[in-house]
């Protein structure tokens, strides 16, 4: 019987991204998990199909091979079978490695070790924090859906009281040789799929995988001064390895939300502050709230122009893993009055009549230079 399409098995489009694949897998795995469907052979079969489809599609190289060649890409053990995790087992080139490995002095090293143990997949978790949290640092609690070591078989995949056995086809090597003409060709063992072992009595909980899918709660330390786009690695917190293999790593990708008032450039902060035309002309003061919870008073001198910057030293962001702190720059914007009353308009017109070139040196000089440029 022809195998079902992996995308159809998971109920996703061929354009589905990593997040959509994982979400679909989790929903279906929960629905058809054997623990929820005891003695239901159809549910068990469906659960295995879902696992196989997800294991193939979550690996970019395997997915690319499947998209191009379909199930033919994995025939004859070309990619090591559907079990296992992470970034182990290379791409479609494994098919050619099986054919030419003997002539080229053996295949390349793999992440699958003796006894069928495989390293778990690395996981990615996207976290969004506020600028205030990036300023002060925090300890965040996150829940990560992942594969963990089965607590019934301790990751061996075998029913308690039993042990995996060496594969009789490859005698535990995970590879078999066949003579073709003048050449001796080495392939991945079709019986154990390169693991070197078989499990006659699978664990009733994980069905021989050595892992089960669950959500884990983890504590993540976000240091003060962390920047947008920073990646935090939690070693050994990724998916559990298959059949007792080492766990993968968890990578936390941080993004800092845009702030309503502040913009960040490294350790420095910038804040645009609008002031009235009269404050700019006559001078004045205003208070600015800073991220450390205090207020800083800014004095605006008489005749302040738009774009003027005032520096508040050490009021910026802390420098990551350092005692240094950036600065806060206040950028002045001058607000033009709107919806003037008749009296306000009259006063401004009177002010304009009383103004001289000395009151507006920049505009006066600009238009004079422009006139000279065009008229010569």
Curated annotation (Swiss-Prot):
CXXCXGXG motif repeats lie at residues 150-157, 167-174, 189-196, 203-210. It is found in: Cytoplasm. Binds 2 Zn(2+) ions per monomer. CDD domains: DnaJ, DnaJ_C, DnaJ_zf. Its cofactor is Zn(2+). Zn(2+) 1 binds at residues 150, 153, 203, 206. One of its GO terms (cellular component) is cytoplasm. Keywords: Chaperone, Cytoplasm, DNA replication, Metal-binding, Repeat, Stress response, Zinc, Zinc-finger. Pfam families: DnaJ, DnaJ_C, DnaJ_CXXCXGXG. GO terms for molecular function: ATP binding; heat shock protein binding; unfolded protein binding; zinc ion binding. Homodimer. The J domain is necessary and sufficient to stimulate DnaK ATPase activity. Zinc center 1 plays an important role in the autonomous, DnaK-independent chaperone activity of DnaJ. Zinc center 2 is essential for interaction with DnaK and for DnaJ activity. This is Chaperone protein DnaJ.
């Amino acid at each position: 019987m022809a195998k079902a399409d992996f995308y159809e098995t998971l109920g996703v489009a061929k354009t589905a991204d990593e997040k959509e694949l994982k979400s679909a897998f989790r929903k279906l795995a929960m629905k058809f998990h054997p623990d929820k469907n005891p003695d239901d052979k159809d549910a068990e079969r469906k659960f295995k199909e879902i696992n196989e489809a997800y294991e193939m599609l979550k690996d970019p190289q395997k997915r690319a091979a499947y998209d191009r060649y379909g199930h033919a890409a994995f025939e004859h053990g070309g990619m090591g079978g559907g079990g296992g995790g992470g970034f182990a087992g290379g791409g479609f080139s494994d098919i050619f490695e099986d054919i030419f490995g003997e002539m080229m002095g053996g295949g390349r090293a793999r992440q699958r070790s003796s006894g069928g143990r495989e390293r778990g997949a690395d996981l990615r978790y996207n976290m969004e924090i506020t600028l205030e949290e990036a300023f002060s640092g925090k300890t965040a609690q996150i829940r990560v859906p992942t594969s963990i070591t089965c607590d019934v078989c301790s990751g061996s995949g075998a029913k308690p009281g039993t042990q995996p056995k060496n594969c009789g086809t490859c005698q535990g090597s995970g590879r078999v040789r066949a003579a073709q003409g003048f050449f001796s060709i080495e392939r991945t063992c079709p019986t154990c799929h390169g693991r070197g072992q078989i499990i006659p009595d699978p664990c009733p909980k994980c069905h021989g995988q050595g892992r089960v899918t669950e959500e884990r709660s983890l504590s993540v330390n976000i240091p003060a001064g962390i920047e947008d786009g920073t990646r935090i690695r939690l070693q050994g917190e990724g998916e559990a390895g298959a059949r007792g293999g080492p766990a993968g790593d968890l990578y936390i990708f941080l993004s800092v939300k845009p702030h309503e008032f502040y913009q960040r450039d490294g350790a420095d902060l910038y804040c645009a502050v609008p002031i009235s035309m009269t404050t700019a002309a006559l001078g004045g003061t205003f208070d600015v709230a800073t991220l450390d919870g205090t207020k800083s008073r800014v004095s605006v001198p008489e005749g302040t122009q738009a774009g003027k910057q005032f520096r508040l030293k050490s009021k910026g962001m802390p420098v990551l893993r350092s005692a240094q702190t950036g600065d806060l720059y206040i950028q002045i914007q001058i607000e033009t009055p709107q919806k003037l009353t008749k009296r306000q308009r009259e006063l401004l017109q009177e002010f304009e009549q009383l103004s001289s070139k000395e009151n507006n040196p920049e505009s006066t000089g600009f238009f004079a230079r422009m006139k000279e440029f065009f008229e010569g």
